Amino acid sequence: MLRKGCCVELLLLLLAGELPLSGGCPRDCVCYPSPMTVSCQAHNFAAIPEGIPEDSERIFLQNNHITFLQQGHFSPAMVTLWIYSNNITFIAPNTFEGFVHLEELDLGDNRQLRTLAPETFQGLVKLHALYLYKCGLSSLPAGIFGGLHSLQYLYLQDNHIEYLQDDIFVDLVNLSHLFLHGNKLWSLGQGIFRGLVNLDRLLLHENQLQWVHHKAFHDLHRLTTLFLFNNSLTELQGDCLAPLVALEFLRLNGNAWDCGCRARSLWEWLRRFRGSSSVVPCATPELRQGQDLKSLRVEDFRNCTGPASPHQIKSHTLSTSDRAARKEHHPSHGASRDKGHPHGHLPGSRSGSKKPGKNCTSHRNRNQISKGSAGKELPELQDYAPDYQHKFSFDIMPTARPKRKGKCARRTPIRAPSGVQQASSGTALGVSLLAWILGLVVSLR
């Protein structure tokens, strides 16, 4: 039989399990303290459940049937809100007014949302991750990202966006990841990416791009990854890619490239590019159909006229000895950076480059891009959003940085100083032994 004291303790434990934390917890939800977390995902809610504690910092409402958001649904104390995969059709402009602590907002996979008011995200000064993938958006209003100076990750993929106006991202000075793939963009103007001075990854594949302004990437000096595959591009000027001095991964396949004279500047840039790039398959002219633009020779452009003459093209070809000498002066990704370009030199640039050190040990997978990378803290391509791993392919990113071929200078043998005996070889040892025996014989006589 249980003692009276034990029964009281058991009753208290049972009551504690039934009582909601911090003054209340919504029905069918689970709440956790420190930090206050409300988990209500996958419960077929048609509206925001009542009774969410005002001190809630993390709220998880994904995989329900919620249809709209308005002011008063959440407390300004909120830091994280996941409300993806619902049926949201409307977000009141002042829904997040005063949410100065909000850092992560996932509104993705609400396919009937379609439009957003310009002031929807106004004042979210700490927001660092914003998920708007698969929201049925066909356009973005001017100023919608105004003031989001802390934003680092912006996911806009798999919408129906056809056009982006100049300076749409101009306030996103700390943005590192911009995902725009799977939309209907047909052109990139001069000022679309203006201000994105810290952008690291730009994914534009699987759009309908036909034209890119030659200054579209002007501010992207820190970009390392650019995907333009599976578009409708036929031409891309080499000058367009010239500002991308830190670029490491480039994909241009899946376009109908014209490999005639118009491709010459891109061909020249690709010859200088030191990173990893896809094939650039030629669609025209007919005699080059199926060839890789990168494999064409100087002679293929000899009859082209324009700013760059065949003589200028030929000047880029190097002899074997020249290439070996050039490698001695070309810094690798792990070597010292040019002060003017903290993230590396323009691919193929020669002036101002620093000579690498003589240490011939290899860099082992530095800055490797892998599938096992961390989750929400540093989202990779496979981490668009929680429970979203099945919605894309893993094979679009390389698994490691491209290996570079380098030559180590032949080591100069170090000779012993004058007067110091070196380690003897077999012949020298025999001579020394013979001399010692002769000396011994002479002394015995």
UniProtKB/Swiss-Prot annotation:
Residues 425-445 form a propeptide. SMART domains: LRR_TYP. Residues 352-366, 401-413 have a biased composition (Basic residues). GO terms for molecular function: chondroitin sulfate binding; heparin binding; Roundabout binding; signaling receptor activity. Belongs to the Nogo receptor family. Cell surface receptor. Plays a functionally redundant role in postnatal brain development and in regulating axon regeneration in the adult central nervous system. Contributes to normal axon migration across the brain midline and normal formation of the corpus callosum. Protects motoneurons against apoptosis; protection against apoptosis is probably mediated by MAG. Plays a role in inhibiting neurite outgrowth and axon regeneration via its binding to neuronal chondroitin sulfate proteoglycans. Binds heparin. This is Reticulon-4 receptor-like 1.
